[in-house]
Amino acid sequence: MQASTKLTLAIALAAGLTAQGALAQEQTVTVMAYSGLFQERYTKAVIEPFMKANPGIKVEYFPLPNSAQMLGNLRAQKAAPQADVVIMDVSVSKAATDEKLLIKIDDKVSKNVADLYPNARIADVDGVAVTFDNLVMLYNSDVVKEAPKSWMDLAKPDLKGKVAIPGMPDIQGLSLVLIMNKARGGADYLKSVDQGIAALGEIAPNVQTWEPKPEVYPVIISGQAVAGAGWNARAQVNADASGGKLKAVLPQEGSVFQINTINYVANGPGKDAGAKFIDYALSPEAQKSFTESMFYAPTNAKAQISDAAIARTAVKSMDKVIPVDWIALAKVREPIMEQWRRKVIPLSR
């Protein structure tokens, strides 16, 4: 064999081994999280920058519409998990924690845990908060000319049949019950939400739908309904997309925080690459990027958010945010749901 041929074969062999080594080293992280707008914005703001900074790690996004379905997937895959990281509501994260489906996220998993706001670390939950959102009142500014000031404006006669609220078991309906319960003098929502249920009973005759589809924002933008309730983050993005037709306000009675947690799946296939993604997702850089992209309030206290973005979150209105222990509330959620079925739904028919 000629020397040149030997050299060519040697180079080819070395190249092949190098390629095999690169393939062997590449890791995949599967992130299970919300579909739709969340997926679109989170991919651009967090996942793509993470992959750029970590060229040896590929992130695959597995979208699902809600946290309950995510928990169902985790349960079904317990023996052989397919996901490494899950972003879901805190109450569902608690259920996954109790079922030992998760690894606790502490400073050993991510150094950024130390910089999270105190309410981002939830007792007896393995995940930590990755976003804060809050309930807002929505309205179609082409029809409703004056910005509403109270949640009870939804009960005004001129809105008969024009209100859309994602009702219970959706957490948005439950949140509105809690807000109005406090506004009307209810002391402990874990003992009674009678005042909140009564308030929703007054709004109910105006409600066109408790199940706006595909979600509440386009229903109000289209004029099918003209007022309602929804989450601030999606409301802000839809307000921009509608050219300002959809508007969102924080009524005088206040709001509550909804907490999305990021969770580390036990025995996930991506191993330590999952922890690396979680660390990045909790970093000031990622928190800033997603807040400025979709207007979720950040959970990392060191995130330097622009004034324009912060103004579109509840961060500057914390005095209006009612504290809720979602974990304790989960224990009384079914009795509240039963009151909703008996005392609210019939009044909207």
Where are these regions (language model features)?
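Early extracytoplasmic/lumenal segment of secretory-pathway proteins
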Residues: 25-92
